[in-house]
């Protein structure tokens, strides 16, 4: 079982070869993982979609809860700087976009389920606390974001960044 750990591995093939050898022939490998761009190096298209959807959120739900800008209305999505990601944690998302291909080389994928977060991971960073179940409007906005993301991923307009995968040797 890999739970948000494979994206930290520098030698995916070596790790997966060992796991494949360790599993019984009728065994299963379960993976819950970030499979998006290495070190969060988003494409211009991904950034454009995130920013466009972000601007659909009314200002009252874009109030930051982050310490450095608490109470201020966010005007744009704050994307991580890949160089800073590498500096802070050299293993963070080092080969994340290669996980699925590496799994396919060593396992038979039985199930692949996109789990959301392609747009929302950074789009809702520090503002997610503004969305409360007791606020029907905020729930409608969240549902709209879920629907846009799900539709774009299902149609191939965006690649999934998170997935649950079941594989066999």
Regions found by a protein language model. Give the residues of each.
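Short conserved AdoMet
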Residues: 10, 24, 104, 108
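C-terminal lobe and adjacent flexible extensions of AdoMet/dcAdoMet transferase-like proteins
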Residues: 105-169
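A short SAM/SAH-binding and catalytic strip from SAM-dependent methyltransferases
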Residues: 1-13
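Short, solvent-exposed loop/turn segments at secondary-structure junctions
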Residues: 6, 36-37, 115-120
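A short glycine-rich, Lys/Arg-flanked "PGG" loop and its adjoining helix->strand segment in the class I
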Residues: 13-28
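Substrate-binding/catalytic lobe of Class I Rossmann-like enzymes that use SAM or dcSAM, i.e.
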Residues: 61-131
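Conserved class I S-adenosyl-L-methionine
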Residues: 28-71
